Curated annotation (Swiss-Prot):
It comes from Streptococcus thermophilus (strain ATCC BAA-491 / LMD-9). One of its GO terms (cellular component) is cytosol. Can catalyze the hydrolysis of ATP in the presence of single-stranded DNA, the ATP-dependent uptake of single-stranded DNA by duplex DNA, and the ATP-dependent hybridization of homologous single-stranded DNAs. It interacts with LexA causing its activation and leading to its autocatalytic cleavage. PANTHER family: MITOCHONDRIAL DNA REPAIR PROTEIN RECA HOMOLOG-RELATED, RECA. This is Protein RecA.
Length: 379
């Protein structure tokens, strides 16, 4: 019985060696035919962690889980009219340029306001803009920009406005069933590999439609078929909530609105998280407002009554004054923003953070030693 077992093990080992050799030969042939990296073991990849770029909103970065939009992935932003979809996308454009990248905007709706984009921090002199005549043209332009590998972000506004050429050439009233869905499906198949290879972020803004005859369930749907839903790594549902009233002379005016951004799909972090941001009319997302709220919630900014303080120093009475203080002191804003991101694990600890942690630990050890010596003296 023992001999039979030993013989079986030898056969298994020999068979395993033959399979391993056959696999190595196959990998060499594939690499020869298709290039290095065509097939590799997952653990051999140099970059296993998903690279991200900040969305331009701290609250949204936290909701996304990874700290921003994943590079080399497709993002869909949809919601009702005037909910803030384009504003969210323009903040991503501004953040890309801030980090030294190049952004392109495919304006299929022909409705981009340069003055508003500039107010959000977009460098309109450096922004690549295209206003295509048809859906195919817009997607072809996006594809060529992505294939170049020189563009970091491409925004398409919007999928619903990508009208197929056949529909433009036809008459109003002609039936074009499934034409836009087929166009988007083909585009996703062609663009997805190139987007991943060049590490370009592709943001598709989409509108909402309602299904006819739906009695139960959610009747809302997005145009352009299902391809974009499948290929998107992140889908954001943007909804405007309550209006924000002004202060002082503008106390009777609506100066902005609270907006809820829900991550309904996320392939790089847990989904279904929500971010609440203040979109101020003519200014975009209030970055100081969200920082004051988030930092005070986790104790980085201390709140006592109506007063806000940081590191023992008062920074304002009421949230509006605290926002103004942070806007006037960008170095304090950056310091608090960094601490919040470290708290939520969006960025790794730097040397300064490690030094601070070490000092805290040393202080606690000294306190324990003092207590022990006190006990010995009393005894």
């Amino acid at each position: 019985m023992a001999k039979k077992t030993k013989k079986t093990e030898e056969i298994t080992k020999k068979f395993g060696d033959e399979r391993r050799k056959a696999l190595d030969d196959a990998l060499k042939n594939i690499e020869k035919d298709f290039g290095k990296g065509a097939v590799m073991r997952l653990g051999e990849r140099a970059e296993q962690k998903v690279q991200v770029m900040s969305s331009g909103s701290l609250a949204l970065d936290i909701a996304l889980g990874a700290g921003g939009y994943p590079k080399g992935r497709i993002i869909e932003i949809y919601g009702p009219e005037s909910s803030g979809k384009t504003t969210v996308a323009l903040h991503a454009v501004a953040q890309t340029q801030k980090e030294g990248g190049i952004a392109a905007f495919i304006d299929a709706e022909h409705a981009l306001d340069p003055a508003y984009a500039a107010a959000l921090g977009v460098n309109i002199d450096e922004l690549l803009l295209s206003q295509p005549d048809s859906g195919e043209q817009g997607l072809e332009i996006a594809g060529k920009l992505i294939d170049s590998g020189a563009v970091d972000l491409v925004v398409v506004d919007s999928v619903a406005a990508l009208v197929p050429r056949a529909e433009i050439d036809g008459d109003i009233g002609d039936s074009h069933v499934g034409l836009q869905a087929r166009m988007m499906s083909q585009a996703m198949r062609k663009l997805s590999a190139s987007i991943n290879k060049t590490k370009t972020i592709a943001i598709f803004i989409n509108q909402l439609r309602e299904k006819v005859g739906i009695m139960f369930g959610n009747p809302e749907t997005t145009p352009g078929g299902r391809a974009l839903k499948f290929y998107a790594s992140v889908r954001l549902d943007v909804r405007g909530n309550t209006q924000i009233k002004g202060t002082g002379d503008k106390k009777d005016q609506n100066v902005g609105k609270e907006t809820k951004i829900k991550v309904v799909k996320n392939k790089v972090a847990p989904p279904f998280k929500e971010a609440f941001v203040e979109i101020m009319y003519g200014e975009g997302i209030s970055q100081t407002g969200e920082l004051v709220k988030i930092a005070s919630d986790i104790g980085i900014i201390q709140k006592a009554g109506a007063w806000f303080s940081y590191n023992g120093e008062k920074i304002g009475q009421g949230s509006e004054n605290a926002k103004k203080y942070l806007a006037d002191h960008p170095e304090i804003f950056a310091e608090i923003d960094h601490k919040v991101r470290v708290h939520y694990g969006l960025i790794e600890l730097d040397e300064d953070d490690v030094v601070e942690d070490t000092q805290v630990e040393d202080t606690s050890d000294e306190l324990i030693l003092d207590l022990d010596s006190t006990i010995e003296i009393e005894e």
